[in-house]
């Protein structure tokens, strides 16, 4: 099978060896890319629309989250195996390209320096290694934290440490943060304040991290969060 790709905007290139389009587009707009596949049986063509704008994820995030399958048992090897399965099964090529590690990737307590620590028993090579593994396969890494001092599972959350946690996540190559609301006050004003704090911290890192809030809908986040604080939210 041979592939030809034409109409790529400036900044993008197609690698025929692995079939991945890579790069970065600086100009906003919609770009129509023409793709043709050909083998001894014939050929077929289709188009791909690439949307570029100032906002992240102009289309919905699609992918996999570890929680319902593995819960607290998530570990590095499982994540890598899931990533490989998403590629080999064709899910990645259909747009399911986020691999999200939910609760329990972190230690129960912070380090003496106040930094959030990756659980080395579960992720012996660290999250940077996991991110690199995913990125090499055209996938994105998502992680989880909470707008309280503890997550839903009882390990350390990010409240009060938004900037240092965001900085560490960006340095690891994280592409998405799911931000829960367990253990936090129930009023809307506090939710807005805590989610805004992490949103600003992520923007300060200068890395494009999708901020996905998970407050279950009780404070009507569709009125104040989407497009202002976050780019995705939990829908029950």
Tell what function each PLM region has.
Residues 2-20:
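Low-complexity "stalk/linker" and mucin-like segments enriched in Ser/Thr/Pro/Ala/Gly
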Residues 20-28:
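Extracellular/luminal low-complexity segments enriched in Ser/Thr/Pro
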Residues 29-33:
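Exposed beta-strand face motif in extracellular beta-rich ectodomains
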Residues 35-37:
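Conserved structural position at the C-terminal beta-strand
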Residues 42-54:
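C-terminal edge beta-strand
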Residues 51-76:
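An acidic-aromatic substrate-binding cleft motif
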Residues 68, 81-82, 86-188, 194:
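Aromatic-lined carbohydrate-binding/catalytic grooves of carbohydrate-active enzymes
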Residues 161-164, 203, 210-236:
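Glycan-recognition surfaces
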């Amino acid at each position: 099978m041979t592939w030809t790709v034409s109409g790529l905007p400036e900044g993008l290139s197609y690698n025929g060896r692995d079939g991945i389009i890579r790069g970065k587009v600086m100009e906003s707009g919609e770009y129509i890319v023409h793709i043709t596949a050909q083998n001894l049986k014939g050929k077929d063509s289709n188009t791909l629309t690439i949307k570029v704008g100032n906002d992240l994820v102009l289309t919905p995030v699609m992918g996999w989250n570890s929680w319902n399958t593995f819960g607290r048992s998530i570990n590095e090897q499982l994540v890598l195996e899931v990533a490989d399965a998403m590629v080999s099964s064709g899910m990645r090529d259909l747009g399911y390209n986020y691999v999200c590690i939910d609760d329990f990737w972190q230690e129960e307590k912070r380090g003496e320096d106040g930094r959030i620590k990756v659980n080395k028993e579960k992720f012996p090579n660290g999250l940077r290694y996991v991110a690199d593994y995913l990125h090499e396969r055209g996938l994105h890494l998502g992680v989880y934290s909470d707008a309280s001092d503890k997550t839903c599972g009882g390990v350390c959350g990010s409240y009060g440490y938004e900037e240092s946690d965001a900085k560490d996540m960006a340095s690891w190559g994280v592409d998405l943060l799911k931000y829960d609301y367990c253990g936090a006050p129930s009023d809307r004003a506090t939710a807005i304040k805590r989610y805004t704090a992490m949103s600003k911290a992520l923007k300060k890192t200068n890395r494009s991290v999708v901020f996905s809030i998970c407050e279950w809908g009780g404070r009507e986040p569709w009125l104040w969060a989407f497009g202002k604080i976050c780019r995705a939210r939990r829908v029950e």
